[in-house]
C-alpha cells in the first residue's frame, strides 16, 4: 500500500531528525532464528487442537497421549508441492503428526517447475495429484501453488473436493469460537455457500473481486 510506505518514510525522516538515525558504535549482534521451524510447530499445534478437540477416545492415558501427539496416525496423505515451496507441509507438519506421507511428490523446490504448473487451478496439476492418490491408495491428496497461499484437495477416489465445501467446512469449525466473524472469499463462489455461512452459521460472507 503506497500510503503505508509513505508513512514509513515519514517516520524514518522524523526519527532521523531526532538523531535516532545515528549509528550505534557498538558491534551489531546477529541472532539466527529458525522461523520456519517455529511456524511448522505452530501449524502442528493448530491441527492437534482441531483434530482432537480435547478428546482422543483412547482407552488409557498412554494411548491418549500418543493419539494426541500423532492425531493423523493411520492416515495416508499425499502432498503435491509442484516443485514450489510447499514441500515442508508434508515433511515438517503432516509427518510429525503421524501421517504417512509416502507417495508425496515434487516436494523439492525447482524454479523450472519440470513436472507441472504449481497451480491448483491447472487441469494437468489436478490430474497429477488425483492419479497419485489413486495409485498410492491415499486417504487424501493436497496440492499447493508456488508460494503456498492457494491449495486444493482430492478425496480417496481422486475426486476434487469442491472449494465451496472446503470453505463451508472450515467456517463450521471456527464458527463456535468466533461467532459472527467474517469469511472472505473471491466472487467465484455459490449462492448456496453464502446462505450456509450467513443463515446456518450466523457468519458474514464478504466477496471480493
Residue ranges with predicted function:
Residues 1-136:
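Gly/Ser/Thr-enriched, mixed-charge loops and adjacent short helices
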Residues 2-41, 45, 157-209:
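Proline/glycine-rich low-complexity loops and linkers
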Residues 76, 141, 182:
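Hydrophobic "anchor" residues on beta-strands that sit immediately upstream
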Residues 79-82, 144-146, 185:
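Active-site flanking residues adjacent to catalytic metal/cofactor-binding acidic residues
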Residues 82-87, 148-149, 189-191:
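Gly/Ser/Thr-rich loops at beta-strand to alpha-helix junctions
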Residues 88-93, 114-117, 151-156, 193-199:
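Short acidic, glycine/serine/threonine-rich loops at helix termini
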Residues 97, 136-137, 178, 200:
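A structural signal for short coil/turn segments at secondary-structure junctions
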Residues 132-155, 160, 205-206:
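Glycine-rich phosphate-binding loop
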